[in-house]
């Protein structure tokens, strides 16, 4: 049986500093929002190639580090209560060329990149050819990463019905490209406004850029 880590802390909304914001964005102003950036991955890509790593799991690991560093990206509704997961794990798309479909596969997050890479590699080896939508099953404490490496974009919006209690961040990666002496990659993120404001997304994206600039290949 797969190990599932689902520890969490319950938020007392009545005492929460975001109480009014949460209630507003859960009722009259209910909304999610998307933001797309052109991430400079020049240094990151160079280090990935130098260390002969795979780009996809390396980038997923950086996103997972950031999601686990900030509580606003680990929130969910569970049994009618707002909770903060102790940890969240990346659920990422795996493309099946033969059927032109994809699967959503999750891997347990680990702080250490090499440990995570080992877990990721095992999961892909075990489930990567399985055509089911969720070949490994589903867990509650996930965030989502989707890859669209066939096209670059400057804007990307998800339109999902019934998002009132869906707080998990959703990332979409596009095709990276060269601009001058830089390599840029489109990256879109969707979050729920009830738990996450522009400040939080901005801080995370700035930290993401710093991680990409300084990444040392899991050393």
From Swiss-Prot:
<keyword id="KW-0046">Antibiotic resistance</keyword>
<keyword id="KW-0614">Plasmid</keyword>
<keyword id="KW-0808">Transferase</keyword>
<dbReference type="Pfam" id="PF00302">
    <property type="entry name" value="CAT"/>
</dbReference>
<dbReference type="GO" id="GO:0008811">
    <property type="term" value="F:chloramphenicol O-acetyltransferase activity"/>
</dbReference>
<dbReference type="InterPro" id="IPR018372">
    <property type="entry name" value="Chloramphenicol_AcTrfase_AS"/>
</dbReference>
<dbReference type="InterPro" id="IPR001707">
    <property type="entry name" value="Cmp_AcTrfase"/>
</dbReference>
<keyword id="KW-0814">Transposable element</keyword>
<comment type="similarity">
    <text>Belongs to the chloramphenicol acetyltransferase family.</text>
</comment>
<keyword id="KW-0012">Acyltransferase</keyword>
<protein>
    <recommendedName>
        <fullName>Chloramphenicol acetyltransferase</fullName>
        <ecNumber>2.3.1.28</ecNumber>
    </recommendedName>
</protein>
<feature type="active site" description="Proton acceptor">
    <location>
        <position position="193"/>
    </location>
</feature>
<comment type="subunit">
    <text>Homotrimer.</text>
</comment>
<dbReference type="GO" id="GO:0046677">
    <property type="term" value="P:response to antibiotic"/>
</dbReference>
<comment type="function">
    <text>This enzyme is an effector of chloramphenicol resistance in bacteria.</text>
</comment>
<dbReference type="InterPro" id="IPR023213">
    <property type="entry name" value="CAT-like_dom_sf"/>
</dbReference>
